[in-house]
Swiss-Prot record:
Physiological role: Involved in the regulation of the intracellular balance of NAD and NADP, and is a key enzyme in the biosynthesis of NADP. Catalyzes specifically the phosphorylation on 2'-hydroxyl of the adenosine moiety of NAD to yield NADP.
Binding site for NAD(+): D89, G90, N163, E164, H174, R191, D193, T204, A205, Y206, A207, L208, S209
GO terms classed as biological process: NAD metabolic process; NADP biosynthetic process
List of catalytic residues: D89
Protein's name in the database: NAD kinase
Gene responsible for this protein: nadK
Entry keyword set: ATP-binding, Cytoplasm, Kinase, NAD, NADP, Nucleotide-binding, Transferase
Cofactor: a divalent metal cation
Species: Shewanella sp. (strain MR-4)
Location relative to the cell: Cytoplasm
Family: Belongs to the NAD kinase family.
NCBIfam families with a match to the protein in the record: PRK01231.1, PRK03378.1
Length: 309
């Protein structure tokens, strides 16, 4: 028997300007990364000289020397007005899944590859960050996903994702069979290597590599992207962000299936399980330098052509 869910429609939040200044700032970074450590040291010194209270995430605090206030990620969320993540999008995603439950702004310094979520350059962050700290910034809310695995009607595992929740085989890729329902309405059965359910934030990540469309961050939508479907007619589909996605795994599948959240957290799935993916009540409060332009980011990161005239 399937599980029925009441679908509610939360209010959308648009990008807004903020003028609130910050007092307590948290520093988060990729552990054991020389470039990240260098940037974190510069940030800590620069912020401390200006009189800010600075808390450093405990996994990187020991690498920054003495006179460092080390705390865990939950304490950064509870105590800080602003969290600065130094690293790539993966580091931002890991921090965001925790910080989204708190009312803390998050901004990134790019020490990764593409860096869709990390705006500030690592070697010249001071000018842009100074303006942000003076209240010259834009705030953008990005919604998260909640993924749940049910077995015989009982919740077995759950977690959140900023980018995507992916149903897939375990360590060895192979075709799996499952049914997909949107708001308890049957959409189709699928034979594929898996299914990506992505937010607009994640539409430039794994979903893009699998042939999905790019969704602008302000869209209240989800995109479902099949992975190597065994039919030529199967294409990605965009649905309302308030939709509840249910995937029912065929009892004929082998074991060792998983649901991955942002590629970081893995939930075990058995044949016959039901996977529910829906919009989370949590939102990431991203801070951008004032005048942030999403299409400039796409041109820069994806190598799109510049203006002709």
């Amino acid at each position: 028997m399937g599980i029925n869910f009441d679908v509610s429609r939360p209010k959308a939040r648009s990008s807004i300007n903020m003028t609130t200044k910050f007092h307590t700032i948290g520093l988060i970074g990729k552990p054991h990364h020389p470039g990240t450590n260098q940037t974190l040291k510069r940030l800590h010194h620069w912020l401390t000289v200006q009189g800010y209270e600075v808390l450093v995430e405990e996994r990187v605090a020991s690498e920054l020397g003495t006179h460092i206030v080390a705390v865990d990620l939950l304490e950064i969320g509870a105590r800080c007005d602003l969290a600065i993540v130094v690293g790539g999008d993966g580091n931002m995603l890991g921090a965001a899944r925790v910080l989204a439950r708190f009312d803390v702004g998050v901004i990134g310094v790019n020490r990764g590859n593409l860096g869709f979520l990390t705006d500030l350059p690592p070697d010249a962050f001071e000018e842009a960050l100074a303006k942000v700290l003076d209240g010259e910034f834009d705030t953008e809310h990005r919604f998260l996903l909640e993924a749940e695995v049910y077995r015989h009607g009982m919740l077995k595992a759950s977690n959140t994702a900023v980018n995507e929740a992916v149903l897939h085989p375990g360590k060895i890729a192979h075709m799996i069979e499952f049914e997909v329902y949107i708001d308890n309405q049957f959409m189709y059965s699928q034979r594929a290597d898996g299914m990506i359910v992505s937010t607009p934030t994640g539409s430039t990540a794994y979903a893009l590599s699998a042939g999905g469309a790019i969704l602008t961050p302000n869209l209240q939508a989800l995109i479902l992207v099949p992975m190597f479907p065994h039919t030529l007619s199967c294409r990605p589909i965009v649905v309302d962000a308030c939709s509840t996605i249910k995937m029912v795994v065929s009892p004929e599948n082998g074991e060792n299936l998983e649901v991955s959240c942002d590629g970081h957290v893995h939930l075990a799935v058995l044949p016959g399980d039901e996977i529910i993916v829906r919009r989370s009540s949590e939102q990431l409060r991203l801070i951008h330098p004032k005048g942030h332009n999403y299409f400039h980011v796409l041109r820069s990161k994806l190598g799109w052509g510049s203006k002709l005239f």
